[in-house]
Amino acid sequence: MNDYKCMIASKEMINKKWNQELAKHENKELWKKFKESSLRNLENRIVYMGILIEEIITECTAIISSNDLDMQNKENLIGDKKAYLTAFRTNKEYEGKGYFSKLYKFMEKDLKKRGFTSLTLGVEPCEVRNIQIYFKWGFDKYIKTCYEYYPNGEKTLVNYYEKTI
């Protein structure tokens, strides 16, 4: 874990990571739309990445402004002192080894330093393992349940939770 570093990603790093995601997913058009959404909202988001020996292995995005053009279900999820966390990703071979937890702690500390007092996130009800992790991290205040819609027309049910920091 000594070679693992957490940081705020540059635009170059964000592009590199999106190109990696595009390369490993079959539905290229959907992932191209996710990339476009991310890049057009950079002024409203902070992207955090975990690097292990020059490889991006974890990432998470904090949406910090309600001006974000693509965030869905914004009501009660984002505000002046409230950030919405999304796009939690860990490369498969590094899951369950504590890397994402370290990135999450780095991100929470940074957002608190920036004046945020609460964080929100969304999780599908079927993602039991993730729900347990988020509860352990303090995301135990239920906010609401809504559908999120993907660019390809699919929809998924999402429960939203909040944590005070």
Task: For each feature predicted by the language model, list its residue ranges.
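Conserved N-terminal entry element of GNAT/NAT acetyltransferase domains
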Residues: 1-16, 20, 165
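Active-site rim helix/loop that mediates acceptor-substrate recognition in acyltransferases
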Residues: 24-53
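A short helix-loop-beta-strand connector motif used in the catalytic cores of GNAT acetyltransferases and
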Residues: 39-50, 58-59, 67-68, 84
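Conserved acyl-donor/pantetheine-binding loop and adjacent beta-alpha core of acyl/acetyltransferases
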Residues: 60-87, 148-153
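Conserved acetyl-CoA-binding loop-helix of GNAT-fold acetyltransferases
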Residues: 90, 96-109, 136
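Conserved GNAT acetyl-CoA-binding A-motif
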Residues: 111-122
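Conserved beta-strand-loop-alpha-helix junction that forms the acyl-donor binding cleft
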Residues: 121-131, 147-153
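Conserved acetyl-CoA-binding loop of GNAT-fold acetyltransferases
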Residues: 134-144
